[in-house]
From Swiss-Prot:
The active site is at residue 62. This is Uracil-DNA glycosylase. GO terms for biological process: base-excision repair, AP site formation via deaminated base removal. It is an enzyme of class 3 (hydrolase). It comes from Streptococcus suis (strain 05ZYH33).
Length: 217
């Protein structure tokens, strides 16, 4: 990340030496137990999607906490792993909205400019939200603010109450915010299914002169 366009802009949004605190936190937690995703994938979202290429932001809460699932991109798992329930529902809504995507791995979205960002970038094995409130929120809020400052139009897809709180950080009138219930089985039938976020995002991007996302890749 140090050599990317992200680095200095994120750094400018944070207290002095915050990157050092993050590295100390990572050294500590990875030395003390099983943490997901693998350490080399903690920053995968901003390593895979260049700042200049961001077209869509899909905000998650924290990584999957089961073995082999988390890969540093919100909602994504390797194709070798069964899709968790929220991802199953995302793919079901995608099928109803645009068409069938076979992959559970969403890397192809990230490579097209979909920033798949979790608010917390690490999680202890088996402990959902186990690192919430410890180190990550100022960092990921800074990422959202950096994207908010871009001149080109971006679509933010905010699923569920936690993600929707971040709407306060999105102040640039060039951007579009799409909100709905979370794709979790607990809430998917309360406004997620039928929300058509993927076609909505592409319609806005193309209306603003940007190429849409091939969501079926």
């Amino acid at each position: 990340m140090e050599h990317s366009a992200w680095h200095e802009l994120i750094k400018a949004q944070l207290p002095e030496h915050y990157f050092g605190k993050i590295n100390q936190f990572l050294d500590h937690v990875y030395a003390g137990g099983t943490i997901y995703p693998p350490r080399e994938k903690v920053f995968a979202a901003i390593q895979t999607t260049d700042l200049e290429e961001v077209k869509v932001v899909i905000l998650g809460q924290d990584p999957y906490h089961g073995p082999g699932q988390a890969q540093g991109l919100s909602f994504s798992v390797p194709n070798s792993v069964p899709a968790p329930p929220s991802l199953q529902n995302i793919l079901k809504e995608l099928t109803d909205d645009i068409g069938v995507k076979q992959d559970h791995d969403l890397t192809a979205w990230a490579e097209q400019g979909v920033l798949l960002l979790n608010a917390c970038l690490t999680v202890p094995a088996g402990q959902a939200n186990g690192h919430a409130g410890q180190i990550w929120e100022p960092f990921t809020d800074a990422v959202i603010k950096v994207v908010n400052s871009l001149d080109q139009p971006v679509v933010y897809i905010l699923w569920g109450a936690y993600a929707r709180k971040k709407k306060a950080l999105i102040t640039n009138p060039k951007h579009l915010v799409i909100e709905s219930a979370h794709p979790s089985p607990l809430s998917a039938y309360r406004g997620f299914f039928g929300s058509k976020p993927f076609s909505q995002a592409n319609a806005y991007l193309t209306s603003q002169g940007r190429t849409g996302i091939d969501w079926l890749r």
